[in-house]
């Protein structure tokens, strides 16, 4: 519990049309969400031109309140978008209850981003 409780998930959103993935990433860049699952987006990192010394990559990272974040990128090998969700909660009290809360938030974020991307 010294480092808090970490909840996470990887979601793969498949499609038969690779153009839908390109369009979804472009839509996220031109019309970024202001909130995901009701949680305000505090900053967006777009790795298309490189970022903090990293090579360019078709990847977007949405920082939410606190340390929660959602990362979206196309798969490099298949017609799908990959979504990574990370939620961190302070666990000074009941670790089990905190873990349940963190995973509940992970699930809410997953449902929200899946609806937003609508592949």
Residue ranges of model-derived segments:
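Phosphate-binding and adjacent anionic-ligand microenvironments
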Residues: 1-73, 82-84, 91-119
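A generic beta-sheet turn/junction motif
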Residues: 76-78
């Amino acid at each position: 519990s010294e480092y808090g409780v970490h909840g996470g998930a990887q979601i793969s959103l498949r499609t038969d049309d690779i153009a839908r993935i390109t369009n979804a990433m472009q839509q996220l860049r031109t019309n970024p969400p202001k909130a995901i699952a009701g949680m305000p987006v505090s900053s967006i990192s777009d790795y298309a031109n490189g970022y903090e010394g990293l090579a360019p990559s078709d990847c977007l990272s949405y920082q939410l309140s606190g340390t929660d974040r959602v990362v979206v990128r196309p798969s490099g090998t298949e017609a799908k978008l990959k979504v990574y969700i990370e939620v961190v909660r302070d666990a000074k009290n009941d670790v089990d209850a905190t873990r349940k809360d963190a995973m509940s938030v992970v699930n809410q974020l997953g449902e929200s981003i899946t609806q937003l991307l609508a592949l």
